[in-house]
Every structure is written in C-alpha cells, then in structure tokens.
Amino acid sequence: MTHTAGRRKELESIMQGPETQSEWGDIEVRLAKADDAPAIETVLSQSFEEYKERYTSAAFKAATPPQEIILKRMEEGPTWVAEQRGEIVGTISAIPHGRTLVLRAMAVPPEERGRALGKLLLVSVARYAFRNRYRRMTISASPFLTRALREYEQFGFQRSKEGPSEFHGTPVYNMTKTL
C-alpha cells in the first residue's frame, strides 16, 4: 500500500467513527459556545497547573488564558469541548492558516486522563479539517508533555522542524499531520 493510500484509509476510518453522543457513551464533543469560556478557562488551568514550574511565567500565562482571551480565540477559529453529563472535561482550539489548521490549547485535566478524551477531541478536529478541505494540521507541545506528545504521534502527527522552537521561552516540538 502506498503512503497516500495508507493515509486515505486512515482518514476514511476517522470519518466513519462515532458521530453522536450516544456512540461515545456519555461524552459529547461539540463546538464551544461563548458561555463555555469560564469552564474552558478552568480546564486549561487544571490541565497545565502540574507543569507550571516547567513553563516560563509568560508561557504558563499564555497556556492558561482568562476567559476574555478564550472568547477572542473563539473568534479566530473553532474551539471544541468534550462534555460529560453537562461538565466540560476537555478542550482544543484551532486557527485556520491557509490550507493548514493550526491546533492549540488541547487540554484534559489530570483526573480525566486515560479515558481517550484527547483522541476524541483530535478525531473531531480531524473531521472538521477533512470536511473543510484542509491539507494538514499542525500542533506544538513542550517536551515535558510526554503523554500529549505520545497521543499526537499515535494519531499520526510527525515531528517537524517547521515552526518556532519555543513558546514564550519554553521549548516546544512542532508536529504535522498531512490529510
């Protein structure tokens, strides 16, 4: 099987995945609304708090923005939330940049990890990217976010030298997934 055929098969598999809340049990991934901003702020804060000492203060502040900044980000591009029984338990956002969808702020609080929420969020974003004819997705993560890096690699992202090597003074790896 050629690389292109393999990628096409992978994308078809993603596109055939669960579409509704019931197919993912009691977890729904949906586009965020403005009134989700306070909960997204909490999820980001909870998700990155354990790494606070490893970030520069500027990077931590940028990774855990207040809801006013979250609302501005929602105007720049789509934001998704994973919701379970009315509670937001994960989030990711994206910025369109030409035919590339730049992902940012993927977060799942520690007590929610290990339940495939990250994968569910990535599947939702990949569907959006595929349906809107993006050619690739990119994401950056700091080296100490080993669980996230592993999740991205398992989802088909590959490390790339494209993009900045740091985020407000904190080192990052850049990753790309061709669609």
Residue ranges and their predicted role:
Residues I14, L31-A37, E41-A105, P109-E111, ...:
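Acetyl-CoA-dependent GNAT
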Residues M1-D35:
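Conserved N-terminal entry element of GNAT/NAT acetyltransferase domains
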Residues E19, A126, L149:
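Short glycine-/small-residue-rich flexible loop motifs, especially phosphate/cofactor-binding loops
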Residues L71, R135-L179:
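C-terminal "cap" of GNAT-fold acetyltransferases
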Residues E87, P109-V123, N132, P143-R150, ...:
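Conserved glycine-rich acetyl-CoA-binding loop
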Residues W24, M74-E75, R131, Q154:
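Short, well-ordered coil/turn elements that cap or connect secondary structure elements
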